[in-house]
Curated annotation (Swiss-Prot):
UniProt pathway annotation: Isoprenoid biosynthesis; isopentenyl diphosphate biosynthesis via DXP pathway; isopentenyl diphosphate from 1-deoxy-D-xylulose 5-phosphate: step 3/6
Protein name from the UniProt record: 4-diphosphocytidyl-2-C-methyl-D-erythritol kinase
Similarity-based family: Belongs to the GHMP kinase family. IspE subfamily.
Function: Catalyzes the phosphorylation of the position 2 hydroxy group of 4-diphosphocytidyl-2C-methyl-D-erythritol.
Protein's organism: Neisseria meningitidis serogroup B (strain ATCC BAA-335 / MC58)
Amino acid sequence: MNIADGRQAFSAPAKLNLDLRITGRREDGYHNIESIFCLIDLQDTVYLKPRDDGKIILHNPVDGMPQEVDLSYRAASLLQKYARNPAGVEIWLDKKIPTGAGLGGGSSDAATVLLVLNRWWQCGLTQRQLIDSGAALGADVPFFIFGKNAFARGIGDRLDEMDIPKQWYVIVKPPVHVSTAKIFTHESLTRNSASSIMPTFQNLQPFRNDMQAVVFKEYPEVWKAYSELSRYGFALMTGSGACVFTACQDRNSAYNIYRQVSDLYEAYLAEGLSKHPLLSV
């Protein structure tokens, strides 16, 4: 969508980890995972405006952080060396995805910047090259570049498309920020879940999140939100938290739960997507 001042609007959807297992720790300190990633229609909007002077300007960094450490800025900076001509861009972020929630908001914004600027700047990078570049920005970035629901392995950069039934999700965000680094370095974290061959959505059930027990121990507010949501059905934490969610087969069922929990918590009602909106552009 074009805006009067020359900006163009692009979607950056959130994700849920419907299953997350840690299968080992690598020599470089990162962890190998296996996870089901699902796109949802809760999304940020990234506004981009091209410049021809080589400058990258992020107009509204998240939480007042310096623009140089923002993932969207870093994504644009990363691509500049591949641009055919001196290229710049102005970036605005309309945030709807809560930060520090396990929903991948910052990573999704960065992936959208990479996908759009790869075209605008005629960088010519393949999807695989974008995925490899995006992995340097964050573990969730490759999935958003892949753009389809997926079973992920490695550090999240080995992706196979997965067929996930259409579902609605109720997402609850407790009033706490979870430190991903703290959870990944916790002595009690499970790091040896059995690795599987490429599964189907059905044969991975019951779903689990290997980080959930540690987060519940260190952040009681997440446990409380999980306990509340579990009253209505099977609940699970996404990513390293803090959000927890439950799935429903139809919107009415999900909305009824949403009405109840939104009186107690910041809550979201979201529909699952089969592919990234930019794949249709």
